[in-house]
Every structure is written in C-alpha cells, then in structure tokens.
Curated annotation (Swiss-Prot):
Coiled coil: none annotated. Residues 26-50 are annotated as: Disordered. A lipid is attached at residue 25 (S-diacylglycerol cysteine). A lipid is attached at residue 25 (N-palmitoyl cysteine). This is Putative lipoprotein LprB. PROSITE patterns: PROKAR_LIPOPROTEIN. It is a lipid-anchor. Keywords: Cell membrane, Lipoprotein, Membrane, Palmitate, Signal. Residues 1-24 form the signal peptide. It holds the Pfam family DUF3558. It comes from the Bacteria.
Length: 185
C-alpha cells in the first residue's frame, strides 16, 4: 500500500510540475482565425541613422554655459547617453542626452503625450521629431524634451529646471539638439 501511495504522489507531483509548461503551449484564444501574427524575416536589418559621439558631441562646458547652472557634474557618461546634475546630486536641475538605437520614437512620443503639458512636431536642421513641454505650478514651463528621428534611431535631449530664475528650457534643448546633429557622423 505504501508503494502505491508513493507512486501516486510522484505521478501527481510530476503532473503538477509539468502543468505550466503544457499550459504555455495551449491555444488560449490569442491566435484567433483571421488574426495576423507579426513576424520579422530572419535577414531583416534595421536602418540606423548617423553615429553620435559620446554625450551627443556636447561638452560639459557647453551644457553649463547654455543652462547657466554652475557646479554641474556629468554623473552618467556612456556610449548612448549622458546626464548632468547640479553638484552631482539628484535634487535640483538635471539635463540629459540619450541615443536610442533601433527604438521607435513613436513610443517615446506617446509617453510624452501622456505625461507632459504639450507635445508638438518639430523640425531641426531638416530632421523631424517632437518637442514636449512640462510645467510645475510654482515654476511654469520648467522642462523641455526634444526627440529627433534618424531612420530606426532617435536622440533625445531633456532639460529640466527646479527653481527660478532659469533660461527658457526649450531654447536650450533645441540648441543642444542642433549641436548634436552637427556633431553626428
């Protein structure tokens, strides 16, 4: 009798362990008749835009001069982005450059549309994208993000101030974007 109980316990344990794998293979209605399943051919290659140097080719000094914020520290610097913070701390103004390779700008724009006061089309030096403005009740328009599309890639400059007075964030974001476009190869 003990042997039968043990075998039954092992069989039930095996079925319980196997259930998630089998359930993952089941037809749960996701592939309904007539539905299309997107696929990408194995040999499809994305079309990349130009190469952007580190930090979009913009120096720490240029960011400091344009933003008029002293004591900026480049706290994150790698091949796809940079971030400048006042005194290196997370409180206060922040400025960043990001380069998204093979990433759809539409998804980023949609996120901006859900979280910013306004999002508009923009064209800088013949390149299309968006400009997003964020505001705070006590500061007014204190954040500006410019995203520009290059084939399957895009870049984004973000300029955010935390206390008055400050220069117009969108003027800075547009100028930084212009400089990055000029520095691209």
């Amino acid at each position: 009798m003990r042997r039968k109980v043990r075998r039954l316990t092992l069989a039930v344990s095996a079925l319980v362990a196997l259930f998630p794998a089998v359930a993952g293979c089941s037809d749960s209605g996701d592939n309904k008749p007539g539905a299309t399943i997107p696929s990408t051919p194995a040999n499809a290659e994305g079309r990349h835009g130009p190469f952007f140097p580190q930090c979009g080719g913009v120096s720490d000094q240029t960011v400091t001069e344009l933003t008029r914020v002293t004591g900026l520290v480049n706290t994150a610097k790698n091949s796809v982005g940079c971030q400048w913070l006042a005194g290196g701390g997370i409180l206060g103004p922040h400025f960043s450059f990001s380069w998204y390779r093979g990433s759809p700008i539409g998804r980023e724009r949609k996120t901006e549309e859900l979280s910013r006061a306004s999002v508009e089309d923009i064209n800088i030096d013949g390149h299309s994208g968006f400009i997003a403005i964020g505001n705070e009740p006590s500061l007014g328009d204190s954040l500006c993000e410019v995203g520009i599309q290059f084939s399957d890639d895009f870049i984004e400059w973000s300029v955010s101030f935390s206390q008055k007075p400050f220069p117009l964030p969108c003027d800075i974001a547009k100028e930084l974007t212009r400089q990055s476009i000029a520095n691209s190869k």
